[in-house]
UniProtKB/Swiss-Prot annotation:
GABA, the major inhibitory neurotransmitter in the vertebrate brain, mediates neuronal inhibition by binding to the GABA/benzodiazepine receptor and opening an integral chloride channel. Generally pentameric. There are five types of GABA(A) receptor chains: alpha, beta, gamma, delta, and rho. Residues 1-25 form the signal peptide. GO terms for molecular function: chloride channel activity; extracellular ligand-gated monoatomic ion channel activity; GABA-A receptor activity. Residues 327-465 are cytoplasmic. This is Gamma-aminobutyric acid receptor subunit beta-4. The chain crosses the membrane at residues 245-266, 271-292, 304-326, 466-487. Residues 26-244 are extracellular.
Amino acid sequence: MWTFQADRLSGIVSALAALCVACCAQSPSTGNISVVKEIVDKLLKGYDVRLRPDFGGNPVTVGMSIHISSIDQISEVNMDYTITMYFQQSWRDKRLAYNDLPLNLTLDNRVADQLWLPDTYFLNDKKSFLHGVTVKNRMIRLHPDGTVLYGLRITTTAACMMDLRRYPLDQQNCTLEIESYGYTVDDIVFFWQGNDSAVTGMEVLELPQFTIIEQRLVSREVVFTTGSYLRLSLSFRIKRNIGYFILQTYMPSILITILSWVSFWINYDASAARVALGVTTVLTMTTINTHLRETLPKIPYVKAIDVYLMGCFVFVFLALLEYAFVNYIFFGRGPRQQKKQSERISKANNERHRYEEKRVREQVDPYGNILLSTLDMNNELLATDMMSSVGDSRNSVMSFEGSGIQFRKPLASRDGFGHHPTLDRHVPLTHHAAARNRANCRLRRRSSKLKLKIPDLTDVSTIDKWSRIIFPITFGFFNLVYWLYYVN
């Protein structure tokens, strides 16, 4: 009986002892801390940080996982992007396995300096730093089977080579490449832990100028002269948001181009207004171009926005040249052409007048009479002048002779009493007709010169009328081709 009671009591004590050990393991008691201290001291005693796990045996497999906290900046000028992330690596080191405590041990970050760590680096890194507020943001956690979890909070600036030919209607592909610096595939093998779910946080990011379209995880082996290395790549594709550029670049350029067309409705003799408007629009487009170049790298090829701004600049500049052409036509070349034309007309009239005088002189008989039958009867001007110089029918007598038609004018008697037809003498009319003809020709030439020298300033220029139609249609066609090409 006493034996049975002793066995029962021993079982109860053992159960209570096991329960106490479990409670002590789960609670931060002084005994538990001492156990952990003993475990850590035991693990680090004789640990050689210079040797990788399973040195000389199979390669160490290191799993990678990343949580993206933010993408802070994407710079076209420097061709890079800045990303803040939680970078975690895990591997198994049998030298760090323990059985005394069935718990994971999260240790101080300074313990990481006493353990072997993978020589991981970012291949396209430009500048990186480990956050150190309030202490270094790194974590080391040990599992009973020897698995080590090493986490860091890193901000890195990585290179991202961009093709800006379609800027700002472009899409870019940026990568973050991870590789071992010294260990080849014979010593260490990287892999994405969790496959496609190894990278998280990308789907909730909101960037001011970009939209993340997709992300891909790639693993490949690369060969260098020092050996083969396994490289992990995080690739994400981003699309630029066009809204900012429409408000800041495209709309101002369109409005300035349309503003330059206002000069087509301004009278062409208002030189100050049209020149001031044209020069102002040209300088404004130049300012927009200059500001844009300062925000982009100096690349050798033409970007999409360069094509658009250059097209707008050409339209604005052509609007200014259009007025220069109109001004030259109406106030430069026009008067010179009119002067040349009036000189040609004057020269032709003088030659005609000399020719007519020569013909008249050749057709005068010895008595000074003009034989009208030999003159050109179709010359209305000369006939009119001759008839007006002779006078009315009461003081003139027309006689028809065999040799032609002659004008005869009666001579006044010496004593002032009337005149007799029989006393008429042949009076030459050559000098009177020629003088009157010359006077009339001079008056007509002067009036024609006045008409030629005074342009009709009340009509709007035909060039301006056509410009009002051609410029908007051409600019609309330019926009149609531009947006169809670059958007699609």
